[in-house]
Amino acid sequence: MQPALSIKNLRKTYDDQFEALKGIDLDVAKGDFFALLGPNGAGKSTTIGIICSLVRKTEGLVTIFGHDIDKDFSAAKQFVGVVPQEFNFNQFEKPLDILVAQAGYYGIKKDIARQRAEKYLRQLGLWERRNEISRTLSGGMKRRLMIARALIHEPQLLVLDEPTAGVDIELRRSMWEFLKQINDQGTTIILTTHYLEEAESLCRNIAIIDHGTIVKNTSMKALLKQLDRETFILDVREELSESPKLEGYPMTLVDGHCLEVDVMKGQSINEIFIELNGLNIHVISMRSKANRLEELFFDMVEKNLVDVDGGQDNE
């Protein structure tokens, strides 16, 4: 079956002779939810930039649903929607106007554009703010607006760069549910993230890139079998004088409003939230610490769990 994305011998060398990509090969199947992970400077942003025609490759072949991004640029572009990490829209425009204008770049008639804009703004909880100046929106709302903008031409491949960075727990999970929904409807999704839990919750397959080389390409299920634990930092509303005692969850009080907890393989962070709520301790934000990607990656290298030859697991 023709993949949604096919990358063959992709190389990128910048003018200063820095070799960002060293001949990577990667296929993403139609309908997949795929994570591309790597330490800062590993090459994932360059890879995403080439896929989205924002960076010019030095060598190699990239096809999107069979369309060569060089020889058939216009067709390939129609298949891709991009959600960058940074807010890159005119924040003095209104959300509805932003979406309708974006649709126009793809030749979509204004009446159809408005129908789609309403659909996505409603689905993403932004319809009531459709006529407000975008700079008045919260960071989470702006991120949802960028997702709506990426979807307005109804691409078959959605690429998200750190889609929930800086987003609170409740909003993050609602965004996860929306992304799962559009993936279930057939949209292929590729995301980069530093949150192991995010990749675990959303993605079926994963590639790890480092120093311009794919060092691991496997299923999420196979990768998780190799991990021991993840450490989370929890910010809580209440001021604490000591660490809560939760059976099976080693927890340290970092300061009055901050806890550090180890979650072992097979355990669920949601269980911690439930138990803390039972103690009238309310988590307002969460971030991964010990197994944020850089540390996870180097831990895997130390344990010889990464196939440095770039081989693919079939599990």
Q: What positions do the PLM features span?
A:
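ABC transporter nucleotide-binding domain
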Residues: 176-264
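Catalytic Walker B motif of ABC-type/P-loop ATPase nucleotide-binding domains
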Residues: 158-161
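Hydrophobic anchor residue at the start of the ABC signature
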Residues: 147
